[in-house]
């Protein structure tokens, strides 16, 4: 047993060292010299095509595939989950043809929230693509990081698989509603400068079944998931500190996505936006002037000292929507110093309120960045 423990500690130490090396490459190369290689910018006029656009877009510097969901066991034990795969371009056309050349780095985050048990668990991975440890296909949808994987099967379903440190998931997701493209003319504008944008779409209501694992215990579950896929090259501007982002699935079969950029001076950024999806899948953009997000209660992180709003009032008068959004568990902060080096809060939320004057309930996910540490504009510049 002592020998196994020593091997395990050595493996973890070596892994930490390899992460330091990879992160050094990421922050020296990825955010310094890469623009000389002319990564493609997210510009108006992009035409989405599915299922092609589920796959990777290696001409762009930054890309992520993001899944969240709220699921439940037959005996009403509730869970939330997040599985995200990130690709960051380092060298668009490496001079060195070696398989060890670093063209892209791949990070991945896995989190499971035991809502009924009031527990939150998180783990992460980071690898380079060149030697097959991680990657993303361009001819079909498959993205992976070691044994974590998201892919589309022959029936058009998404399958997710990830397991590490006593938490994991094995889920099958049906598409549900058609893809929702955010923004206008094929782009979601994030800043004033041309190219400070992304190509961004979502699958907003995906029937889900499979299994969740937490603390080594497996639970069979069903529920709903949400997928985001976003790609671009330069996203934010230096005045932008972070964002508050909500994806809400309401019990009247509608969905609401809102994001609010916060500036370093505390003011709301003009490039705040959102999307409303009706019960038939038709989507409409919500302008910044059409909604407000008001924090009602805070949670102080004992790990980072950051104060995160965990109750929000959401008002969209143009849609006659008035909601209260509450964190299902207050502590859903992700400490990602071994991968993206960004501490952020991302977790399951519960929704109550009114829509069109009638009571409505729902569930969803809330993401809050820029509350702990560096501004997000230093990362996604």
Regions found by a protein language model. Name each.
Residues 35-381:
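Structured soluble/peripheral alpha/beta segments that form catalytic or ligand/cofactor-binding pockets
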Residues 17, 31-36:
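Intrinsically disordered, low-complexity Ser/Thr/Pro-rich tracts
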Residues 20-30:
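Bacterial N-terminal signal peptides
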Residues 10-21:
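Bacterial N-terminal signal peptides that target proteins for export
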Residues 2-11:
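Asp/Glu-rich intrinsically disordered low-complexity tracts
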């Amino acid at each position: 047993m002592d020998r196994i423990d020593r091997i395990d500690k050595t493996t973890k130490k070596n892994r930490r060292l390899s992460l330091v090396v990879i992160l050094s490459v990421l922050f020296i190369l990825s955010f310094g010299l890469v623009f000389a290689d002319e990564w493609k910018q997210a510009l108006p006029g992009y035409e989405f095509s599915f299922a092609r656009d589920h796959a990777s877009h290696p001409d762009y510097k930054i890309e992520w595939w993001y899944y969240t969901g709220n699921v439940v066991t037959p005996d009403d034990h509730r869970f939330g989950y997040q599985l995200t795969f990130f690709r960051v371009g380092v060298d668009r056309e490496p001079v060195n043809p070696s398989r060890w050349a670093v063209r892209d780095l791949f990070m991945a985050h896995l989190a499971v929230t035991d809502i009924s048990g009031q527990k939150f668990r998180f783990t992460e991975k980071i690898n380079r693509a060149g030697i097959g440890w991680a990657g993303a296909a361009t001819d079909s949808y498959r993205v992976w990081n070691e044994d974590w994987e998201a892919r589309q099967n022959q029936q058009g379903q998404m399958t997710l698989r990830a397991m590490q440190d006593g938490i994991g998931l094995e889920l099958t997701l049906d598409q549900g509603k058609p893809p929702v493209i955010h923004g206008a003319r094929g782009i979601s504008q994030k800043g004033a400068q041309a190219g400070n944008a992304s190509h961004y779409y979502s699958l907003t209501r995906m029937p889900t079944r499979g299994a969740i694992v937490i603390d080594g215990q497996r639970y069979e579950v069903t529920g709903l998931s949400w997928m985001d896929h976003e790609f671009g090259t330069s996203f934010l501007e230096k005045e932008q500190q972070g964002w508050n982002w909500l994806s809400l699935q309401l019990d009247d079969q509608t969905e609401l996505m809102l994001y609010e950029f916060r500036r370093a001076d505390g003011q709301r950024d003009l490039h705040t936006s959102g999307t409303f999806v009706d019960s038939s899948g038709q989507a409409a953009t919500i302008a910044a002037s059409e909604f407000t997000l008001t924090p009602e209660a805070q949670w102080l992180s004992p790990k980072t000292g950051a104060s995160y709003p965990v109750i929000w009032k959401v008002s969209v008068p143009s849609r006659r929507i008035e909601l209260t959004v509450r964190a299902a568990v207050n502590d859903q902060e992700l400490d990602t110093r071994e991968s993206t080096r960004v501490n952020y809060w991302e977790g399951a939320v519960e929704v109550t309120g009114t829509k069109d004057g009638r009571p409505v309930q729902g569930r969803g996910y809330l993401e809050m960045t820029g509350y702990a540490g560096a501004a997000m504009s230093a990362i996604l510049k």
